[in-house]
């Protein structure tokens, strides 16, 4: 591993996909970045649905679940508060975005209801959030349901900020490819084969970026992976480049919180040795407070509020 520090080489980039090589880092760091990009970048998603009228063939819960999985624009999500940190009773413009949907089957044929039919009624205050992500050529978005003549669907959705650790609907990435040691020099992969592993296991496209092993070379027990091939695909709620950038930023904050806790622990030990009993008596409590600083550190603090919001047509978009 070089002492130059982490290096990134972009191999391919598009609107929804970026392929890059991350080098001069160890396996733990590369895998931490992968996990953070998958589950710890905040986005906006529909969290609860109030159904006023539903005469379709689909149950309220079924439609609520489909609504929850619709990607919503989350570019300015940092300007939105977590609902658990907001001082409002249920939801407000500072912690949520309210969308409405009203559709009626008027034609003799089937009427399709798409995510484009969702209308934002909240005051966005200039923030780029809440709009359904529409990527198809027709500009319709996600199909929510189908209506026959005379059927009606009328509902109100409340979208809130969250991370994929709470529910997959808040995940910003559709898929993340992750590979290292394509020639299997480190023997981390045990190939299963019938006759010849070289013929039955096709080579990865990443093999061309590394030298093949020489036949007869001794195995290096001290060798470690330091080059990782990653491909990130976004669902559209956040641009794919921001998925990577915000993943790095989130990982830095998590490491910083640990460093802060360790630093304070060392300071408490110094104070204890010098006879500061007040500080020493609060060592355990203060360390716990530092570790739980920030909304991202405790995504389950409102676990008791994650059930159904009550009767009267409310359903969680889970």
From Swiss-Prot:
Changing residue 9 to E: Transcript termination readthrough. Its main location: nucleus. Residues 309-318 have a biased composition (Gly residues). GO terms for cellular component: nucleoplasm; nucleus; RNA polymerase II, core complex. InterPro entries: DNA-dir_RNA_pol_30-40kDasu_CS, DNA-dir_RNA_pol_insert, DNA-dir_RNA_pol_RpoA/D/Rpb3, RBP11-like, RNAP_Rpo3/Rpb3/RPAC1, RNApol_insert_sf, Rpo3/RPB3_RNA_Pol_subunit. Residues 297-318 are annotated as: Disordered. One of its GO terms (biological process) is transcription elongation by RNA polymerase II. The modification N-acetylserine is found at residue 2. CDD domains: RNAP_II_RPB3 (cd07031). One of its GO terms (molecular function) is protein dimerization activity. Residues 299-308 have a biased composition (Polar residues). Pfam families: RNA_pol_A_bac, RNA_pol_L. It is found in: Nucleus. Present with 10000 molecules/cell in log phase SD medium. Belongs to the archaeal Rpo3/eukaryotic RPB3 RNA polymerase subunit family. Component of the RNA polymerase II (Pol II) complex consisting of 12 subunits. NCBIfam families: PRK00783.1. DNA-dependent RNA polymerase catalyzes the transcription of DNA into RNA using the four ribonucleoside triphosphates as substrates. Component of RNA polymerase II which synthesizes mRNA precursors and many functional non-coding RNAs. Pol II is the central component of the basal RNA polymerase II transcription machinery. It is composed of mobile elements that move relative to each other. RPB3 is part of the core element with the central large cleft and the clamp element that moves to open and close the cleft. Seems to be involved in transcription termination. This is DNA-directed RNA polymerase II subunit RPB3. The gene is RPB3.
């Amino acid at each position: 591993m070089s002492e130059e520090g982490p290096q990134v080489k972009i191999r391919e980039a598009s609107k929804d996909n970026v392929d890059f090589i991350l080098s001069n880092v160890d396996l733990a760091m590369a895998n931490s970045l992968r996990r953070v990009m998958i589950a710890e970048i905040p986005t906006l998603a529909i969290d609860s649905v109030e159904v006023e009228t539903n005469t379709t063939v689909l149950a309220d819960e079924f439609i609520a679940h489909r609504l929850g999985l619709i990607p919503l624009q989350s570019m300015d999500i940092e300007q939105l508060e977590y609902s658990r940190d907001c001082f409002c009773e249920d939801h407000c413009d500072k912690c949520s975005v309210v969308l409405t949907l009203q559709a009626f089957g008027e034609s003799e044929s089937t009427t399709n209801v798409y995510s484009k039919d969702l209308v934002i009624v909240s005051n966005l205050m200039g923030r780029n959030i809440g709009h359904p992500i529409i990527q198809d050529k027709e500009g319709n978005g996600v199909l929510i349901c189908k209506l026959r003549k005379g059927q009606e669907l009328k509902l109100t959705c409340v979208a809130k900020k969250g991370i994929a650790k709470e529910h997959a609907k808040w995940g910003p990435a559709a898929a993340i490819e992750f590979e290292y040691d394509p020639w299997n020099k480190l023997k981390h992969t045990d190939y299963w084969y019938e006759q010849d592993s070289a013929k039955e296991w096709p080579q990865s496209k990443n093999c061309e970026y590394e030298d093949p092993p020489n036949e007869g070379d001794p195995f290096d027990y001290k060798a470690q992976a330091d080059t990782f091939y990653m491909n990130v695909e976004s669902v559209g709620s956040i641009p794919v480049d921001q998925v990577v950038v915000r993943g790095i930023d989130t990982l830095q904050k998590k490491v910083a919180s640990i460093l802060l806790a360790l630093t304070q622990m060392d300071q408490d030990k110094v104070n204890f040795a010098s006879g500061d009993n007040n500080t020493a008596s609060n060592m355990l409590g203060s360390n716990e407070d530092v570790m739980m600083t920030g909304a991202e550190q405790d995504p389950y603090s409102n676990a008791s509020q994650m059930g159904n919001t009550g009767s009267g047509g409310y359903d969680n978009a889970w």
